[in-house]
Amino acid sequence: MPSPLALRPYLRSEFSPSVDARPCSSPSELPAKLLLGATLPRAPRLPRRLAWCSIDWEQVCLLQRLGAGGFGSVYKATYRGVPVAIKQVNKCTKNRLASRRSFWAELNVARLRHDNIVRVVAASTRTPAGSNSLGTIIMEFGGNVTLHQVIYGAAGHPEGDAGEPHCRTGGQLSLGKCLKYSLDVVNGLLFLHSQSIVHLDLKPANILISEQDVCKISDFGCSEKLEDLLCFQTPSYPLGGTYTHRAPELLKGEGVTPKADIYSFAITLWQMTTKQAPYSGERQHILYAVVAYDLRPSLSAAVFEDSLPGQRLGDVIQRCWRPSAAQRPSARLLLVDLTSLKAELG
């Protein structure tokens, strides 16, 4: 019996968002504020589409490292005196093409402004001398805490096989708080999808919570612009993402649609309400079962049975992780359902 999982295809060869392939911004060495004795070389021009976001390196001041992921490190810093987060994308020695793709994918949200999306402030492909960085992205500082940390209380824990911290029970998240955070995330998805952008790696670890208790979607390194996908005769399937949150149609190598984010949201909402990890077991076994046998996390927890709002929330989750992408609700319909449910809860 052939496997329902798709063979991993090669990435397309060009990821620059512009036909102008020149490097973005400058300098190749950091200025005196970051590296004593360095000089500022002449700044090459950005690709025309991104010229507005060239980095003024003299205004950058790194403060502390916040963490590291599969494609780079994130630092807290100030830029022009304002708190920001700075992401340095590594030159992945095993798959540099994937690193390049991650860098340019992060800029899919350049110029976009929304309360529930982490904003890109500036970007550059110029890096400090001797560094292993492919490029630098300066982003709005969305907060010190991720939704993953709020759910599991996992701040400071080592990373697990799925690229997230090992889980332990966190503080209580009320049903009302789950719905509040869910509305933030769905509002962000609705905006992204209206711009023909799909995130493709939505999960609690990629959702920041600001000091104002607002959820902001971050980490667009796996994102795609739907219009770009249509430009290639052979489909482009992102290599990144987190397998526990990945829609079954993507695991099978089918086309990318916004409904893949809706599936990921369903797993995320399930995590918020149960405070549990979605699956346990061998990665390949889970992938096969999700595709071949419609494996999903259990909805037998008391939170989905003890109250009418809990039952309705379980129904919402079930609709969002249906095997057929066409049968899942859009972000707009989901927003209506969750708003109604939150009003019912009071």
From Swiss-Prot:
> From the UniProt record, which GO molecular function terms apply?
ATP binding; MAP kinase kinase kinase activity; protein kinase activity; protein serine kinase activity; protein serine/threonine kinase activity
Q: Provide the E.C. number(s) assigned to this enzyme.
A: 2.7.11.1
Reactions it catalyzes: L-seryl-[protein] + ATP = O-phospho-L-seryl-[protein] + ADP + H(+); L-threonyl-[protein] + ATP = O-phospho-L-threonyl-[protein] + ADP + H(+)
Q: Where is the Protein kinase domain?
A: 60-341
Alphabetically sorted, this entry's keywords are: ATP-binding, Cytoplasm, Disease variant, Kinase, Nucleotide-binding, Proto-oncogene, Serine/threonine-protein kinase, Transferase
Q: In which tissues is it expressed?
A: Highly expressed in oocytes. Lower expression is detected in early embryo.
Q: Name one GO cellular component term.
A: cytoplasm
InterPro entries listed in its UniProt record:
Kinase-like_dom_sf (IPR011009), Prot_kinase_dom (IPR000719), Protein_kinase_ATP_BS (IPR017441), Ser/Thr_kinase_AS (IPR008271), Ser/Thr_Kinases-Pseudokinases (IPR051681)
Which residues are catalytic? D201
Q: Does the keyword Phosphoprotein apply?
A: no
User: SMART domains of this UniProt entry?
Assistant: S_TKc
Q: What is the effect of changing A123T?
A: In a lung adenocarcinoma sample; somatic mutation
Family, per entry: Belongs to the protein kinase superfamily. Ser/Thr protein kinase family.
Q: Which disease is it linked to?
A: Oocyte/zygote/embryo maturation arrest 20: An autosomal recessive, female infertility disorder characterized by early embryonic arrest and fragmentation. Early embryo fragmentation is defined by the presence of anucleate cell fragments derived from the blastomeres. Excessive embryo fragmentation is associated with deleterious outcomes, including decreased implantation rate.
Its annotated function is as follows: Serine/threonine kinase involved in the regulation of MAPK signaling. Is an activator of the ERK1/2 signaling cascade playing an essential role in the stimulation of oocyte maturation.
Write the protein's name: Proto-oncogene serine/threonine-protein kinase mos
Species classification: Eukaryota, Metazoa, Chordata, Craniata, Vertebrata
